């Protein structure tokens, strides 16, 4: 454990941010699973609705640095391709 006050504070902040980011990553994965589940059941309407929720979320997390912008683009591209194939 750190001895310097500022290092202790940064350790606490890092842990707080880690928990927050883990929560956001979990939520993102859940929403991605919803889109994939709709695609699996071949429900285009539900897939489009779920995609409308996921796309801005991916962009937001890419902007905030939770995921890279390429990863966000890759997810959106692949999901849209799967939806169009229905």
Swiss-Prot record:
Keyword Ribonucleoprotein: yes
Chain spans, region Disordered: 1-26
Keywords, sorted A to Z: Ribonucleoprotein, Ribosomal protein, RNA-binding, rRNA-binding
An annotated GO cellular component: small ribosomal subunit
Molecular function GO labels: small ribosomal subunit rRNA binding; structural constituent of ribosome
Disulfide bonds: none
One Pfam family recorded for the sequence: Ribosomal_S20p
UniProt GO BP: translation
HAMAP family reported for this sequence: Ribosomal_bS20
Family that this chain belongs to: Belongs to the bacterial ribosomal protein bS20 family.
Record's function text: Binds directly to 16S ribosomal RNA.
Protein name stated in the entry: Small ribosomal subunit protein bS20
Organism: Idiomarina loihiensis (strain ATCC BAA-735 / DSM 15497 / L2-TR)
Organism phylogeny: Bacteria, Pseudomonadati, Pseudomonadota, Gammaproteobacteria, Alteromonadales
């Amino acid at each position: 454990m750190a001895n310097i006050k500022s290092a202790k504070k940064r350790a606490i902040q890092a842990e707080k941010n880690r928990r927050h980011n883990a929560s956001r990553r979990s939520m993102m994965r859940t929403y991605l699973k919803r889109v994939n589940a709709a695609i699996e059941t071949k429900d285009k309407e539900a897939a489009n609705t779920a995609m409308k929720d996921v796309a801005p979320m991916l962009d937001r997390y890419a902007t905030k640095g939770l995921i890279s912008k390429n990863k966000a683009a890759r997810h959106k591209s692949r999901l849209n391709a799967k939806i169009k194939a229905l």
